[in-house]
Amino acid sequence: MDLLSPLSAVILTYREADANALGRIGEEMRRCIEVIGPKTPMFVLHTCHRVEAYLYGASEEELSSLVERYKRHVESARILRGIEAARHLFRVAAGLESMLLGETDILGQLEEAYDRQVRAGFTRGLLKTVVERAVRVGKKVRTETGISRGPAGLGSLSIIYVSQFVDLKSAKVAVLGAGAVGAGLAKELAERGVAKLYILNRTLEKATEVAKKTGAEARPLTREEVERCLLECDVVFSAVHTLEYVIDMIPPGASVKVVVDLGVPQSVAPGLPIKVVRLSDLAELAQRYSALRKEEAKKAEAIVEEELEMLPKALAKRAVEEAVAEVMARAVEIAEEEGRRAGCEVAQLAAKTTVKRLLLPIVEELKKMAENGRVEHALEVSQIFTRLVGAPHGEPQNLKTVK
């Protein structure tokens, strides 16, 4: 039984599309996951350099529908399946697919998207395991290699770039957005000792949270506050995802000298009468630092392949856990019922404990069977137990397509 075969991914990155196209498709996928996610497990990773949608057990019709949504904005998108889809996600988490090799921002963005989509119920079952393992790979790569030494991500590169024009130690700086990139920018700017730092976010609580960690001042992300920052600050960094420009004019008497646009799509209007730094301006700097990390990248690639080899066993273990979870829950429920009939809390607890002690060794054996490649046998046995204890008959989530 190949538990990776139901995995598929639709991939679009900075190599195939510009920031504006990625932004539009990212918004499209945000709506799409709310339609597909409740029916089919789905995970969407949208950053300034990529929009990637992963599905588990999707029908060809669902996959085609997803691709068509991409094609509303670009000519084509890559489709990856099975182990190749997992390999790509592992490489993304490791920073091997980034403009800046080994950047750490992507790992934070991956975890942020994962947490949000698990809470929403979209990323679940065996897809959840795949994404969890990708996060594990990302952390392992950064712990065991030196691939992330130096600039942590595009935010770090943009700070290096801006420091060519502005003395940051004497500058007032504003960061628009308090997500993974914005928070990273704030942390590094604070470490560099900027004269004054402001954090703006649509949710003031999130801005306050970042501000407390960095000694900054939190403000709401409103048009009035953005204009105020342009008047007061020397540098403004924009790291927000929006379909509208957050900066579309420079007010008279503004102090701002440089605006950095890390938004996807672009969040700063073209043609402004000041220096605007775009993602494309950072490409040369990214190449320079990436070249220094190539030896460490080889070590990271080896880790990716090692973890990829272990993925089938992890999926098998999770598949059996899902299959027996309902059995265990139903058995405990029956034990509690019998205990209540006895009219004694002690009897109820004893019945429940006895059932768990009887079933747990069986559950562990089923997991071992799955890990040793006998997934189908383990699932067959678990389904026999399902019928015996009277739980609703059926295969575990997302396995009906795996034959």
From Swiss-Prot:
Question: Taxonomy-wise, where does this protein's organism fall, top ranks first?
Answer: Archaea, Thermoproteota, Thermoprotei, Thermoproteales, Thermoproteaceae
Q: What's one GO BP annotation on this UniProt entry?
A: protoporphyrinogen IX biosynthetic process from glutamate
Q: Does the keyword Oxidoreductase apply?
A: yes
**Which gene underlies this protein?**
hemA2
Known SUPFAM superfamilies for this protein? Answer: Glutamyl tRNA-reductase catalytic, N-terminal domain (SSF69742), Glutamyl tRNA-reductase dimerization domain (SSF69075), NAD(P)-binding Rossmann-fold domains (SSF51735)
Domain text: Possesses an unusual extended V-shaped dimeric structure with each monomer consisting of three distinct domains arranged along a curved 'spinal' alpha-helix. The N-terminal catalytic domain specifically recognizes the glutamate moiety of the substrate. The second domain is the NADPH-binding domain, and the third C-terminal domain is responsible for dimerization.
Explain the purpose of this protein: Catalyzes the NADPH-dependent reduction of glutamyl-tRNA(Glu) to glutamate 1-semialdehyde (GSA).
- HAMAP family per the UniProt record, alphabetical: Glu_tRNA_reductase
Residues annotated as binding NADP(+) are 177-182
Q: What is this protein called?
A: Glutamyl-tRNA reductase 2
PANTHER family (alphabetical): GLUTAMYL-TRNA REDUCTASE
Q: Name one GO molecular function term.
A: NADP binding
Q: Its annotated pathway?
A: Porphyrin-containing compound metabolism; protoporphyrin-IX biosynthesis; 5-aminolevulinate from L-glutamyl-tRNA(Glu): step 1/2
**What is the top EC class of this enzyme, as a single word?**
oxidoreductase
Q: Does the keyword Transport apply?
A: no
Q: Which family does it belong to?
A: Belongs to the glutamyl-tRNA reductase family.
Active site residues per record: 48
Q: Where is this site: Important for activity?
A: 88
List ligand-binding residues for substrate. Answer: 47-50, 98, 103-105, 109
Q: Spell out the InterPro entries in the cross-references.
A: 4pyrrol_synth_GluRdtase, 4pyrrol_synth_GluRdtase_N, GluRdtase_CS, GluRdtase_dimer_dom_sf, GluRdtase_N_sf, NAD(P)-bd_dom_sf, Shikm_DH/Glu-tRNA_Rdtase
Q: What else is known?
A: During catalysis, the active site Cys acts as a nucleophile attacking the alpha-carbonyl group of tRNA-bound glutamate with the formation of a thioester intermediate between enzyme and glutamate, and the concomitant release of tRNA(Glu). The thioester intermediate is finally reduced by direct hydride transfer from NADPH, to form the product GSA.
How does the annotation summarize its subunit structure? Homodimer.
Catalyzed chemical reaction(s): (S)-4-amino-5-oxopentanoate + tRNA(Glu) + NADP(+) = L-glutamyl-tRNA(Glu) + NADPH + H(+)
Under Enzyme Commission nomenclature, its number is: 1.2.1.70
Which keywords label this protein?
Answer: NADP, Oxidoreductase, Porphyrin biosynthesis
